[in-house]
């Protein structure tokens, strides 16, 4: 080539930056790769451009934990809510949703919200589940009224235990008489 282009030096390729819009589907996970056809480097000798591969880095949430297509969150409740049950509004991927906490729930029990997890990439109409893990939080600072109520509850529960234990002992004594 006698008269080489001063921009490309006769190669037909000029280095530069280009903004490419990439559609990211719901449900992608960290380190997922998306291929964008013919948006990569220019081909050699006038050939077609290569493909652009975008590697996704998904930021972790402070509230949700993801395992596959299921998401987990924690729900702190009071001992009274655990004993009596309650209706509580929780945060989900789609906004707020009311769930029912059954009476007698224990720390570590979970409540499943079916279909409220992350969409499956191959089947976007289907989703994983949202699992709400219950944590019963014992109060550390009590008002005088709360302290008195807890004392009364303590006495009631201890009397019930003492009654149960004495009835068991009476049965054992009856066997030996």
Where are these regions (language model features)?
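Non-catalytic interaction modules of co-chaperones and other macromolecular assembly/maintenance factors
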Residues: 1-177
């Amino acid at each position: 080539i006698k008269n080489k282009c001063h921009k490309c030096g006769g190669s037909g390729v000029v280095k530069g930056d280009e903004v490419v819009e990439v559609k990211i589907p719901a449900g992608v996970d960290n380190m997922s790769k998306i291929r964008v056809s013919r948006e990569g480097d220019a081909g050699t000798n006038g050939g077609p451009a290569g493909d652009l591969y975008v590697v996704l880095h998904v930021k972790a949430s402070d509230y949700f934990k993801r395992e596959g297509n299921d998401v987990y969150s924690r729900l702190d409740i009071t001992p009274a809510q655990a004993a009596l049950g309650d209706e509580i509004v929780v945060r989900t991927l789609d906004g707020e949703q009311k769930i029912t906490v059954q009476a007698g729930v224990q720390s570590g029990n979970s409540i499943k919200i079916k279909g409220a997890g992350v969409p499956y990439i191959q089947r976007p109409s289907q989703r994983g589940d949202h699992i709400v893990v219950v944590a019963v939080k014992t109060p550390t600072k009590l008002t005088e009224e709360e302290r008195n109520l807890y004392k009364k509850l303590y006495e009631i529960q201890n009397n019930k235990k003492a009654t149960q234990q004495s009835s068991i002992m009476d049965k054992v004594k009856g066997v030996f008489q």
